[in-house]
């Protein structure tokens, strides 16, 4: 059953819980490090043959139930005119950040089929090698992309982003509308290139209060999902939405319109599922640090998550964030094998949904 992941996204019965892992292709793998010695990070992302090879590494090494394209959330911003580099020890840097309404007004229109064509080519290459195993495309969400564009890189306080929201609301919503259109176009292009599902990463949205998420973000994320569904109709593949520290935003997140909602490790899976509603599938939610623990602890934590899911159709096992750089490869393999061998209960539990 090579479609377990897609069936779980649609809350259909499966013979076992599917598993894939965010950042499953990464520095913890020696195969990845060997390639990284020869290429810069952006060079890897922008070279379709290399991105395809890296995408396939964890599929070949661990037998995960889905591949996710090797890419990054920020390169689509280059099409708008933002200048992006990755600095050693510093991460991504945007050299002309957005700081004024004028900066928003001069952003270019772009077609991701041209500006991010390398990722679409990589998707096509990977698709040919998967023999029916699902392939996941992805993008950053409008809020997270806006935050990077305004902060000029990573941030802990999001001070510039929040000030821009509060002080320049018209320019903020203009920016978010532009990014919503960009992300919709990009994800549709990925689907047309072969993606069987798409994930929207809202890595920083957990920094917002529910009131601010409703006022400044929700409608733009909804518009993104609605645009994909309107343009693709009945052939729209599963849409996954993921962010960290989102437990306080459950009432808002359940309104986005995604098929699958990602859950991080800061909340029990059954509690999150009840809050999100059982009309959604859920994905998660092992703490990535658990993979540094002995196998007995990995098994105990994974078993707890699987028992909380209880065999209810619609659970995809994943981490609550990406795999960390120094993670032992054998522990990743152990986790995948444990989840794939864990028997589903005969009947799903009766859980009370939070209204």
Swiss-Prot record:
Cytoplasm found in the keyword field: yes
Main localization of the protein described in the UniProt heading: cytoplasm
GO BP field: heme biosynthetic process; protoporphyrinogen IX biosynthetic process
Cellular location(s): Cytoplasm
Residues the entry annotates as binding substrate: 23-27, 72, 148, 203, 321
Family: Belongs to the uroporphyrinogen decarboxylase family.
Protein name: Uroporphyrinogen decarboxylase
Biological source species: Chloroflexus aurantiacus (strain ATCC 29366 / DSM 635 / J-10-fl)
């Amino acid at each position: 059953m090579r479609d377990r992941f897609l069936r779980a996204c649609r809350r259909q019965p499966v013979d076992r819980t599917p598993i894939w892992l965010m950042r499953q292709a990464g520095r913890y793998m020696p195969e990845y490090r060997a390639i990284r010695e020869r290429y810069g990070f952006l060079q890897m992302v922008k070279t379709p043959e290399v991105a395809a090879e890296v995408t396939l590494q964890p599929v070949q090494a661990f037998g995960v139930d889905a591949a996710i394209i090797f890419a990054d959330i920020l390169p689509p911003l280059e099409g708008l005119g933002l200048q992006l580099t990755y600095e050693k020890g510093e991460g991504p840097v945007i050299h002309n950040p957005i700081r004024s309404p004028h900066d928003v007004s001069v952003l270019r229109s772009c077609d991701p089929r041209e500006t991010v064509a390398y990722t679409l080519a990589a998707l096509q290459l990977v698709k040919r090698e998967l023999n029916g195993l699902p392939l996941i495309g992805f993008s950053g969400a409008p809020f997270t992309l806006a935050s990077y564009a305004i902060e000029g890189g990573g941030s802990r306080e999001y001070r510039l982003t929040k000030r821009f929201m509060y002080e320049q609301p018209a320019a903020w919503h203009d920016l978010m509308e532009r990014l919503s259109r960009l992300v919709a176009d990009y994800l549709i292009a990925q689907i047309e290139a072969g993606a069987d599902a798409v994930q929207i990463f809202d890595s920083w949205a957990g920094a917002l209060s529910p009131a601010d998420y409703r006022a400044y973000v929700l409608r733009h994320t909804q518009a993104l999902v609605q645009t994909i569904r309107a343009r693709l109709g009945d052939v729209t593949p599963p849409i996954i939405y993921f962010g960290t520290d989102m437990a306080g935003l459950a009432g808002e997140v359940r309104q986005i319109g995604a098929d699958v909602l990602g859950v991080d490790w800061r909340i029990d899976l059954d509690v999150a599922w009840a809050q999100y509603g059982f009309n959604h599938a859920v994905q998660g939610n092992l703490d990535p640090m658990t993979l540094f623990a002995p196998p007995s602890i990995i098994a105990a934590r994974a078993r707890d998550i699987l028992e909380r899911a209880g065999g209810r159709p619609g659970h995809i096992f994943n981490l609550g964030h990406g795999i960390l750089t120094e993670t032992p490869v054998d522990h990743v393999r152990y986790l995948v094998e444990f989840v794939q061998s864990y028997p589903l209960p005969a009947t799903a539990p009766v859980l009370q949904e939070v209204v």
